[in-house]
Each structure stands twice: as C-alpha cells, then as structure tokens.
Amino acid sequence: EEDRFNKIKHFNPDSSPIPSISFVKQCAYHYFILKKFKNINFDCVFISTYDRNNDQWEQEIINNILEQVTCKKWVFNKMHHEHHAVCGFYFSKFNEALILVSDGGGEVIPSFNKTKQPYQTMESICFIDNKLKIFYKAASNYRGGIEDKKNDYKFKINETDILLTSKAISGLKYLNYTQEAGFGNHQEGQLMGLAAYKNKNTSISKSLLNIANKAQEETLEEKINLIKKAKKYSDCKNIILTGGYHLNCSNNFKLVKQFPELNFFVDPIPYDGGTAVGVALYEHYKK
C-alpha cells in the first residue's frame, strides 16, 4: 500500500531483478506510511511476507521496519496463504467457509528434492469456522527453469495434502502469459481485458488475443477443478476466493455462474496488501 502515500504507482522497494540489490533497497527504504504513526506506541506489530526463502534477509528487512515504528512487541511468520484466507473470511461475515487461495507465490514448502528454486505455494484450500484447517496446498518450483524440473510429487504434512510440481500453475501461469504478451508486472488486468476481444472485429493482433484467451480459459479450468477438489473436503456451501489471481473479476464471475449452488464471496483485498489484515486478525484471534 506504500504507493498510495509516496505517489509512485506500483511501487515496490525490492523490485530489482537482482536479488542482492532488491534486498539492499528494501533494507534501506523509509516508508511514508510509517511516518504517519511515528507518535504511536503499538501494543504489537504483526509482519507478513510472501517468503523470500532467506531468514537472514527477512530479519534485516524486519529490523528496518521496526526502526521506523515504536512497539511493545512484534510477531512475524510466513503463513502467506493462511493470511490471505483469514482476511477474506473476516470480510465475508460467513460463520464458516471454504477458502480458495490462488496466487503467484507464497510460503515455501520443504522438499527432499534438491532444487535451485524452492517450491512456493501457489494454491491452497482452507476451511474456517472457529478454527483454521488447511486441506490442500500446491507448490511450484517452475521459476527454477528446465534444470530444476522434477516429476509431480504428492504427500501429506500433518493433515494437509501437498502437491509439489515443476509446472507453472495458478497466478504464476497467468503471469507467464502476461509476460509472453509483452506486458510487465502488475499489468495482468490488461491481458484479462484483451480476452474479451477474442471474436470481435478489432485491429488487435490475433496472436495477442490468443494469448489472452488462453490465459483466461486455462486458468478458469484450473479454478473450476480447484473448487471441485474443495467440495470433496467439505460440504460447506460458502466459498471465498482470494489471492492475487482473484483480482481477475471476469473469471470470478464465470466461477459464480459455473456453481450456482454455492455462495461465493470475493475477498476485497485479494492481493498481498490483504495479508497485512490477515496476519493481524490471525494473531489476534488464534488464542
């Protein structure tokens, strides 16, 4: 949310493609938004992350933030998809719900496979009533490239079904199509909009329209299958959609039409800003 205060659209202090430079920039950045709270002594500051898979880096970034606020204590964890889920559940006002999180990244799931790129969670199925239960997570190491490619692997961590894959799935798949179409970060909405022109009389190139259509259709089918999977875990009729992928209002609408028997709610903050709400609520209510 920093860009709302420093007036730099899509601002990201760690946007450099070189990880070491990204890290240095984020550790040195002074947040405009935190200046608004300089005279407040918070009872607790809760910190969320998409998981950089480097605890030392995470800690130094946290230290930079803590130098800019006053608080009695602070809490940090890497439950990225759970924070998305809790945020969506809070705004839904449901008493119970199945939450589907679809994202371009998230917390790392450890693997016995030695890979250059860790497996980052891309999809989750959770259930919340008065407790949070995680039924399923799918994680991908696709960003590691061909040398990192492994066969799909399924197993359990406690009660959670885990899928590890080297395929591009969920928000990562959509991001890949966005880049293939020549768009940059945060321009997924441009691709979504183009898909509506697939069979129209337009000067937009057919190749571009085909990419946009593939992105919409393939990921829609993926989400339909994820909802079907969720229904096998619980007969709850309340479904919450969250995670950055569900900024895709066009496919959200199609999902609602596909399953008229279900009660849908789309998280109003499905992008990563919502995890700040989610972590605070999770830590406050988990007792």
Task: List the predicted regions and their residue ranges.
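Short acidic/glycine-rich loops and adjacent helix/strand connectors
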Residues: 1-287
